[in-house]
Design a protein with these regions (language model features):
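Structural/interface elements that position substrates and couple domains in central-metabolism enzymes
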Residues: 1-176
């Protein structure tokens, strides 16, 4: 997705092309802001650590971990590139959980993105269909405003960042 941005390629066409190879498939080939959760990040770190303990470097696994962390910054950088100075800007965050259909925020990219936005002086309005109580608990010390609907979060915002691909967030009705 990052290369597609730089060369002007349609990431959806590239995704479909790569995914058409039966050896790869397209189930998990979606661009995004990084993975999270309680299992995959921990397992990747453990695998890399075990290899290092035995004198081996798993370069691909270590690159996966490094790129995942970088992806969280890509969202922030895109917002900064689009909006310039973020001080006083309002950014709506759609999706707080690490994946749809859960309230689990462990290792969720949203926490990193929100933290960076707030550090840059932006106002953050957040919406998630089920993870807002968990987000309030985890980020209780941060001045995040929680909206009752996705549209309330977006109203008057300078930008909207979709961080969790809930079905209801994918195709907004902007005439709402």
């Amino acid at each position: 997705a990052n290369l597609c941005d730089r060369v002007g390629a349609d990431v959806e066409m590239v995704r479909k092309g790569i995914g058409s190879d039966a050896r790869i498939g397209n189930k998990f080939l979606y661009p995004g802001c990084g993975y999270g959760g309680s299992c995959f990040p921990k397992d990747v770190k453990a695998l890399a650590h075990t290899a290092r303990e035995h004198g081996y470097t798993m370069q691909v696994i270590e690159a996966v971990e490094r790129v995942n962390e970088q992806q969280k910054g890509v969202v922030f950088e895109k917002l900064r590139a689009a909006l310039g100075d973020l001080r006083g800007k309002v950014v709506a965050i759609w999706g707080l959980a690490f994946k749809p259909e859960t309230d689990d925020m462990r290792e969720a990219p949203a926490e990193v993105v929100i933290g960076r936005l707030l550090d840059a002086g932006a106002e953050v309005r957040a919406y998630d269909p089920v993870a807002m109580p968990e987000s309030r608990r985890r980020m209780a010390d941060l001045p995040v405003r929680y909206a009752q609907t996705m549209y309330e979060a977006a109203e008057g915002a300078d930008a909207v960042a979709l961080l969790t691909e809930w079905k209801e967030l994918r195709m907004p009705d902007w005439t709402h």
